[in-house]
């Protein structure tokens, strides 16, 4: 029974729309900014770096804490821990409170990676930074970092591979419009 409570809690934690909450407190309607997405990247488009950093931290933290709680209460049963990670991302992407219209899951995925392993986290962050600095597209950086984390897990952390493959597929699914925009040269670019 305890394991099922942890799984439900993972979805609920993931579904807390921190970016939307913190921007509303500042009088900003995130749905009317940039892409209209409720993730940390769109908070950055408001021009408020502090809010963007806070959104990134909080969205990552909920992924981390969901996995951490599962690790503590699921007797190191990998199945429940991995499902809790997926549910945290699903909660972020499809929050019940917002008619299942949420963010793209990248920051939450980062938090999950931190909970699992620092090596794969560093790979994710380094790839994200390199691609972002080279091309100035957050979406391309996110997709590249996610793909690299999935590939890394296949070669070096096989126990995480299926979980990260599922999360990666979800991240790509939520970025479908960005992928089309990238291919058409219409994607939003961050300038210095």
UniProtKB/Swiss-Prot annotation:
Transmembrane intervals: 5-25, 50-70, 78-98, 112-132, 153-173
GO biological process terms, semicolon-separated: phospholipid biosynthetic process
InterPro entries on file: G3P_acylTferase_PlsY (IPR003811)
Record-listed E.C. numbers: 2.3.1.275
Cellular component per GO, a single term: plasma membrane
Catalytic activity: an acyl phosphate + sn-glycerol 3-phosphate = a 1-acyl-sn-glycero-3-phosphate + phosphate
Localization (cell): Cell membrane
Keyword vocabulary terms for this entry: Cell membrane, Lipid biosynthesis, Lipid metabolism, Membrane, Phospholipid biosynthesis, Phospholipid metabolism, Transferase, Transmembrane, Transmembrane helix
Key word Nucleotidyltransferase present: no
Keyword Cell membrane in record: yes
Membrane topology according to the record: Multi-pass membrane protein
Pathway connected to this protein: Lipid metabolism; phospholipid metabolism
Entry's Gene Ontology molecular function annotations: acyl-phosphate glycerol-3-phosphate acyltransferase activity
Subunit text: Probably interacts with PlsX.
Matches recorded under NCBIfam families: glycerol-3-phosphate 1-O-acyltransferase PlsY
Family the UniProt entry places it in: Belongs to the PlsY family.
PANTHER family in the record: GLYCEROL-3-PHOSPHATE ACYLTRANSFERASE-RELATED, INNER MEMBRANE PROTEIN YGIH
Protein name as annotated: Glycerol-3-phosphate acyltransferase
């Amino acid at each position: 029974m305890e394991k099922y409570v942890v799984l439900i809690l993972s979805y609920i934690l993931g579904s807390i729309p921190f970016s939307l909450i913190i921007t509303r407190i500042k009088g900003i309607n995130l749905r009317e900014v940039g892409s209209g997405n409720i993730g940390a990247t769109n908070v950055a488009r408001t021009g408020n770096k502090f809010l963007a950093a806070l959104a990134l931290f909080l969205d990552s933290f909920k992924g981390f804490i969901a996995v951490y709680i599962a690790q503590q209460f699921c007797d190191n049963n990998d199945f429940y821990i991995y499902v809790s990670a997926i549910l945290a991302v699903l909660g972020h992407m499809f929050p019940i409170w917002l008619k299942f219209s949420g963010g793209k899951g990248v920051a939450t995925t980062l938090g999950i990676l931190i909970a699992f392993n620092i090596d794969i986290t560093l790979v994710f962050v380094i790839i994200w930074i390199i691609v972002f600095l080279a091309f100035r597209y957050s979406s391309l950086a996110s997709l590249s970092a996610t793909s690299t984390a999935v590939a890394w897990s296949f070669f070096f952390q096989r126990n995480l591979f299926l979980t990260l493959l599922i999360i990666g597929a979800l991240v790509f699914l939520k970025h479908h419009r960005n992928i089309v925009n990238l291919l058409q040269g219409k994607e939003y670019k961050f300038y210095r």
